[in-house]
Curated annotation (Swiss-Prot):
Name of protein: Ribonuclease E/G-like protein, chloroplastic
Organism of this sequence: Arabidopsis thaliana
Gene designation per UniProt: RNE
Function of the molecule: Involved in intercistronic processing of primary transcripts from chloroplast operons. The endonucleolytic activity of the enzyme depends on the number of phosphates at the 5' end, is inhibited by structured RNA, and preferentially cleaves A/U-rich sequences.
PROSITE patterns associated with the record: CBM20
Family label: Belongs to the RNase E/G family.
Amino acid sequence: MDVTEVPWRRLPQFSVSSRASWLVSSGFPLSSYMFSHVERGKTFRLTLCFGVSRLRPRSAIPLRFLLSVFSEQPPSRLKGLCEVVWIVEADLAANEHLYVTGDPSTLGSWEPDCAISMYPTENDNEWEAKVKIASGVNFRYNYLLKAGYGSSSDVIWRPGPQFSLSVPSSVNQDRKIIIRDSWMSMSISSKSQESYGWGSWIDDAYLFPNCVTPAQSEDECTSADSAIEVPRTHLNDKQVGAESFLCDELAAFSSENSNLSALFSDNYQPIEEPWLIQESITLQHERNMQTDSEQDVESCDDNENNLNTDEQNHQLTETLLPDGGFFQSESIATTILINSSICTVQRIAVLEGGKLVELLLEPVKTNVQCDSVYLGVITKFVPHMGGAFVNIGSARHSFMDIKSNREPFIFPPFCDGSKKQAADGSPILSMNDIPAPHEIEHASYDFEASSLLDIDSNDPGESFHDDDDEHENDEYHVSDHLAGLVNGTVVNHGAVEVGSENGHIPMERGHSADSLDSNASVAKASKVMSSKDNKWIQVRKGTKIIVQVVKEGLGTKGPTLTAYPKLRSRFWVLLTRCKRIGVSKKISGVERTRLKVIAKTLQPQGFGLTVRTVAAGHSLEELQKDLDGLLLTWKNITDEAKSAALAADEGVEGAIPALLHRAMGQTLSVVQDYFNDKVEKMVVDSPRTYHEVTHYLQDMAPDLCNRVELHDKGIPLFDLYEIEEEIEGILSKRVPLSNGGSLVIEQTEALVSIDVNGGHGMFGQGNSQEKAILEVNLAAARQIAREIRLRDIGGIIVVDFIDMADESNKRLVYEEVKKAVERDRSLVKVSELSRHGLMEITRKRVRPSVTFMISEPCSCCHATGRVEALETTFSKIEQEICRQLAKMEKRGDLENPKSWPRFILRVDSHMSSFLTTGKRTRLAILSSSLKVWILLKVARHFTRGTFEVKPFMDEKTVNERQHQVAISLLKKADAIADSSGKKKLTLIPIKKEKTSGKQRR
């Protein structure tokens, strides 16, 4: 009989809240399956077999979840214990034993010593374990393999993913849950077949989205070699029927990951969607499990009934897709507030659920902005830093990283004979030969599945530049482009002339060359590297080059540049000197495949493309129009660069450095990245900004214009939403938590440290103490993600959580942080907690933090947070007086106080109070101890810790010094008169008489 295959999709409740591979009971029809995971050396093989009838290939359905399939619901039920039986087919050695381990509350412990042993059954290579578990619980479990007996046994294999099982709340008396797994090796000979493992946890394949509906009852799982009859059930309000069937043939699916080089350890577990299999699951169909390598993996039989069945399944798959073709994240009410300013700083606040989560500040007059493109001049090469300094017109020269295997955009450009090189470095097109948007040829949409898999899976050649990570937190799975390829065609670069002048850049940072000394000269390094490898061979000091700002200057550091600009629009990211195709990981299923094909079709020669999340669901015409705008922008950039370079060669002053393309302002950037269908409204308080935003949306997203509101009330916008106080609290080091704990945030030059304090949230003993610590750490995890996003903290962040004894609690805290940072636009990476409770978080920094922009270093403490103690300043005053006494020729008679030296001491008000308080003041003690007279004066402009010590001079001494100065001036005047031959000018010093308070009229 025909087998009705139900397409699936991932439900929200099975999101990345756990790293487990979920094993959930299901009530919808599914073919018999056999799941195999076999280790051979350093390679894991994953095999899934579906029952197929009529000996025809079926549509490739990926394994998103391991399913426990149950039969129809029994009439009688009761609550209590349910027996769960694990039956595993495994080919083990004589001294090897299989165990089951799981959650401590259900299966005892995750530790190998406390694992539940599985015993061999009557059948060969079959192991069984029985456990009674309370009804209505959900628990995780896993398998492990031990070699040996007793205390001498060693764990030789422990897979990474953890499975999950939901036990129904009501249990039939004579029923039990049976879980069948097969770990038998299967040899499949196919050149075209690829093998994938659990080394990658992100889905990126030609896969249909799957749907799993939890079962409403507890029933027995089906075996891989038995026929079952499953009742009709509902999937997302769609009724799907099935008939009993007999398994006629097994179609094998396999996948592998070449990067998997080691077994999983206890500390290393999949961190993101571990139940997904990377890349495509290729369908293999032949009776003897052998496939011709030249056979199309998506070929189908000519049987019309079979084709109709596949088409129905495909239509149902598309119907079950979420809106937009990609997985929707948890919906949170988002509001964007824009507080405009004419002469100071424009403020943009992002509210999620009524709470301030992000604050963006943009000074009205900004010289350098991130993503702006300049024509700069190379001023100095720094081979030991792997880059060069470039003058782009800013106060400090900017650092540019160099990739020696990627050709830059320089003027004059590289030449190969009489041909100009294209944007990707091939001698095909000149700068003026970049295809216009309307000249792009569009390929046919007739494609095969195998070609889809090869769109972005070329052999990895050159690695992309370091700023490949997206600022809007769109993660991309794209393959490295192959050096020397133009959209898959091999071209000959030809010989590149080697320059004879100094200043050639030797190699990119991190390039390994054992024959080169680290202190070798640039010329020597250039000789070692071949011209084919070093595409910067003609670049030298004074070369004009197109660069883009990837990170704004911070403190004493100048901006960071890249020689390979990257232009962004609403739907695309255009990558220069690249041939890669990428799609946001937030898009999956059929929509992901469609966008891949469109991107490959529209890809301009010599450029790479990345599809952004917002592009999901948009038509080809909309995507092409958006890409045409990017190509036109790049053409304008190259034209401006050529004009500026020619003007500089003709001696025009100020021609370079030149701004070629100004980055989009903060306002429109937020509209582009944030403003979508999930945003409830955007409120602006300036008619000028309102017109700017609506004018931009008229072309990009007209349907969102009605969500833009103009605030014209008397109360300020931020006061209306009560966020001014939260902005004031950004400078505070201590952040209180809702449960009584607190965070202490310390920002240094190297990193940011965050300390979690328990405070009043700590109470109880034993288990209650551990529970209280967990609650504080979980609350801190959520607040930390909010604070680093709100303060725009970048770089390395080290979090010191309260120590926890339970490893599972550490896992919960780690998962909470991972979940909390998902909504951050910047790229955030989180490490697991260490033995000492430390977590390392890295966040991409593209601009100065909010704290840096709204504050400046303290003139007293110099940004250290501490000022000099008054006792220390008092000691310094004593040392300074002693230093000046040592320089004096006459120190006076110690027995005659009138002859003691006199000094004037100027201090701040705090130090003055410190010296003059008490019965016997510190000033008197200092004077009598050093045998000096001290005249104390308060300088109001002095900061704390500042003082000045000068010798005191009476009026007679001052007059004598003034007389000496006057005599020296007379001598200079006489000398000048003698040399010039003019009349002598005599200067007579006149002593000014004191005048009375009343002036005569």
